[in-house]
Amino acid sequence: RMRSNKAMINRRNLSGFVHALKAGEAVWFAPDQDYGSKGSVFAPFFSVKKAATTNGTYALSKLAGAPLITLSMIRRSDKKGYHMYISNPLSGYPGEGKVAAAAYMNKIIEREILRAPEQYLWMHRRFKTRPEGEVSLYK
């Protein structure tokens, strides 16, 4: 990973992300991962009404004030490279509050997945964190 990146920032180092953004650096992280209940809210994601969704995107937007874009790579049908999709800066984000921001971001992620759903990493346990008292979706 380091070969093509300037640096790696630990996902728990929010101030490192904010500092890099305020210095004009581009940062990337995966908001579609389940990072656990701490630092997450529950928002709809496809047909799952309560998917743990990171507050990291919301926090970075509020603290750094940097524009957000999406970047998706879709494997070419000839398997010789990728098509890269880079969005315009997202408008209307973060909206009002963490849950609204998470729902907005999940809709964006859904849109990107639907470009080529067969290429999404469905095997990762995106829904492992559940609201207290709710049963696992993997049993």
Each model region followed by its residue ranges:
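Non-catalytic C-terminal accessory region of glycerolipid acyltransferases
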Residues: 11-139
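Membrane-interfacial amphipathic helices and adjacent loop/beta segments
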Residues: 1-12
